[in-house]
Amino acid sequence: PVTIQGVADNNPAQPFTPVTQHQRPGLLLMDGVVYAAFGAHCDAPPFRGWVVGVSTAGQIRAMFSTRAGDAAASGNGIWHSGSGLVSDRAGSIVFATGNAFGNGSPSTPIPGSTPPPDLGQTVARVTVQPDGTLRATDFFTPFDALTLDAADVDLGAGGPVSLQQAYFGTPAHPNLSLEIGKQGYLYVIDADNMGGSQQGPGGGDLLVNRLGPFGGVWGRPGVWPGDGGYVYIPYNQGSMGVYQYGLDGTGKPT
């Protein structure tokens, strides 16, 4: 066994405090490293979202914090209601975060290619660096992240899903990801350009599409690529939404 301890690679002033961290999402094994994500125990501070990489040889390779802008602040946990971390390309990990508790969510216009140090209410991509550490390289935060935060409507109650390019996507957006959380909107994200914060028209979202709202999700959608492609969404009220993939008149996935 390996004891996870140490400080964040992206903020050495921020220690990992295991007594208030909870490892809920499914693990990811990638290139000989097991990646585990952490959130809170019922939001008891201090906690942050973490992605920790431990090699199969038993060495800690990465400790990435989603709340690196303020070493003392809490928030931005990764919990996904148990659904796992996602890798949709070599050396890359995608996850979603929950409540930021104040100033921990991007709330100004920021391009996706320049992620800020605090990533609350966000779908984020981190990339493995030559030294094994992780660096945020792309992200999407809904324009109304502060409203979600105030109402305890975690985006990260649901985990992200990567869609297979051979069955989904368009010429303009060949690689797609999905995210849906407590609010019930299904965000269709360009996985190559995730959208940043307030990069759309009028300061809105830069997305391939936003569908819904449907019921809130504590989990993540399932995907069937056959028969034209289907997405299955498990709503929190006990029902299952079944949606066939298609394109609208403008070529957007629906």
Regions found by a protein language model. Give the residues of each.
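Noncatalytic, solvent-exposed loop/strand surfaces
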Residues: 1-254
